[in-house]
């Protein structure tokens, strides 16, 4: 701890190597790179973080979703490009009320389907199946509003949160801004 110029106390943290960090500096790193355990081993160099998060994403999406679907023989999730577009949409809209219909409309209106197999708007049931696969793989979590008095879920739109904010930032190119939704996502998991 040390006194700040404003008279308050600033927390300082020392790592195993004796390196001293300011608590705000560590929080800023967490909101940017997330809290995946391997980051403690590889450090916070952007190239290494990007490679590690790409590995997590590839393992979760390719192995946990696409390969699992093949093994189950259901073949519900067949379009890897559509899956990625839905992931990108949800990552970009954490904490927003979201529906399968709004995802489909956005993908079509913004021309986001033109580089995949699909040229038309996917069915709502298809988008729901893809979102279901993402929540089953624990990449995203859906939160629905609950009426405490009526003891039932409301029929309003749900919100989605991503399992690790670093994964979201990796997917969206580590862009700046959107701190409100980033903080909301972090608080959801605390």
Task: Cite the ranges covered by each PLM segment.
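Amphipathic alpha-helical "lid/sensor" segments that cap RecA-like P-loop NTPase cores
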Residues: 4-60
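Accessory nucleic acid-recognition modules appended to NTPase machines
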Residues: 41, 45-190
């Amino acid at each position: 701890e040390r006194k700040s110029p404003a008279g308050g106390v600033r927390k300082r943290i020392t790592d195993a190597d004796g390196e001293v960090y300011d608590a705000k500096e560590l929080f800023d790193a967490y909101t940017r790179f997330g809290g995946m355990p391997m980051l403690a081993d590889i450090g916070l160099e952007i190239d290494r973080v990007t490679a590690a998060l790409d590995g997590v994403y590839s393992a979760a999406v390719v192995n946990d979703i696409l390969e699992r679907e093949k093994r189950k023989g259901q073949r519900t999730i067949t379009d890897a490009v559509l899956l990625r577009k839905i992931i990108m949409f949800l990552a970009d809209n954490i904490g927003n009320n979201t529906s399968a219909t709004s995802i489909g409309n956005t993908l079509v209106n913004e021309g986001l389907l033109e580089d995949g197999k699909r040229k038309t708007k996917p069915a709502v049931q298809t988008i729901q199946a893809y979102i279901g696969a993402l929540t089953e793989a624990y990449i995203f979590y859906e939160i629905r509003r609950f009426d405490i008095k009526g003891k039932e879920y409301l029929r309003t739109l749900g919100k989605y949160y991503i399992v690790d904010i670093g994964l979201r930032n990796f997917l969206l190119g580590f862009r700046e801004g959107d701190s409100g939704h980033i903080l909301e996502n972090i608080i959801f998991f605390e």
